[in-house]
């Protein structure tokens, strides 16, 4: 029901949702503003299964540099959420991204497991190991990035009260998103671009992916259209840190339930349905 209401709100051009306090919101999903600003965010997922595919030669790379090139060429700011396994695999890239003022880096756990289950088919992270998932990646960000934001995005956007406390106790602000870019496994850049552009509203946080490969093959080629069309509509691109200076909009209700639709084409689902469950192996 929440997803349906979100879709209707986007279609009808409803006004931004009422603001809520930091204490009331489980995540920062978007800013309550009438200003045409939007934050593009990109997750660099890496599960143990993805790492095995890389080492076994099944996948050439889990770093889609064309995503970064598209952003740089168009001077579009972005916030990048990196998993610890991804940082360990691409330490030089992490350093380069951290040094680029166009970007800011955040924490996306160490191994991209579920902090709350069921969460699609992501493998569960036991409660006793969740703090280490956050801290290990924090240590890696310190080592390879130096400069980073204390922002955390839950894998699959799945969490519960205990997981939230674990993350917040380590000094992190939890970041979600109100627009699922639906680029996971989608092969059509035009479809990804059209989906994002049609749902963006002032203060939106768009969730996309930067690991490429078979899991997110269309993202880089969708970005030129996304950036060009949103700028034509008067939008400018900001980082999550810019949105956090504004009041928070009402949180988006992200379903934390298992769904087995791997046999369905990605583009049959609404824009607000997340596909991160495909990444768990």
Residue ranges and their predicted role:
Residues 1-62, 94-95, 225-229, 233-281:
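N-terminal pre-catalytic segment of deacetylase/amide-hydrolase enzymes
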Residues 20-106, 111-117, 138-143, 148:
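Active-site beta->alpha N-cap acidic-glycine motif
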Residues 37, 62-66, 89-92, 129-132, ...:
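Extracytoplasmic/secreted proteins, especially bacterial periplasmic and envelope-associated proteins
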Residues 42-44, 82-84, 107-109, 154-156, ...:
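A cross-domain feature marking catalytic cores of carbohydrate-active enzymes
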Residues 48, 58-59, 82-91, 153-160, ...:
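Acidic-and-aromatic substrate-binding clefts and catalytic sites of carbohydrate-active enzymes
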Residues 68-82, 104, 122-158, 165, ...:
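CE4/NodB-like, metal-dependent polysaccharide N-deacetylase domain
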Residues 101, 187-189, 196-210, 215-218, ...:
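Accessory recognition modules or surfaces
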Residues 148, 163-200, 235-246:
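His/Asp/Glu-enriched short active-site or ligand-binding loop at hydrolase and phosphoryl-transfer sites
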């Amino acid at each position: 029901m929440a997803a349906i209401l979100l879709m209707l709100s986007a279609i009808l051009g409803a006004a931004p949702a009422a603001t809520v306090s930091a204490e009331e919101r489980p995540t920062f999903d978007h800013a309550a503003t009438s200003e045409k600003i939007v934050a593009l965010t990109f997750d660099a997922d890496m599960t143990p299964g993805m790492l095995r595919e890389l080492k076994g030669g099944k996948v050439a790379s889990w770093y889609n540099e064309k995503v970064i090139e598209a952003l740089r060429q168009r001077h579009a700011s972005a916030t990048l959420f990196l998993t610890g396994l991804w940082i360990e695999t691409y330490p030089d890239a992490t350093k380069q991204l951290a040094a680029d003022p166009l970007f800011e880096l955040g924490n996306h756990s160490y191994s991209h497991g579920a902090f709350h289950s069921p969460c699609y088919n992501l493998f569960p992270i036991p409660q006793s190991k969740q703090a280490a998932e956050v801290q290990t990646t924090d240590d890696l960000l310190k080592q390879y990035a130096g400069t980073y934001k204390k922002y955390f995005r839950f894998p699959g956007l799945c969490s519960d009260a205990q997981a939230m406390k674990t993350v917040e106790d380590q000094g992190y602000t939890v970041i979600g998103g109100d627009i699922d870019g639906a680029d996971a496994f989608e092969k059509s850049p035009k479809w990804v671009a059209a989906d994002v552009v049609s749902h963006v509203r002032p203060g939106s946080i768009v969730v996309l992916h930067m690991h490429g490969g078979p899991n997110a093959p269309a993202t880089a080629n969708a970005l030129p259209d996304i950036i060009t069309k949103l700028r034509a509509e008067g939008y400018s691109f900001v980082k999550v840190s810019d949105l956090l200076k504004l009041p928070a909009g009402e949180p988006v209700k992200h379903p934390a339930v298992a769904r087995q639709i791997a046999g369905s084409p990605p583009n049959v689902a609404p824009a607000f349905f997340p596909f991160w469950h495909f990444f768990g192996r």
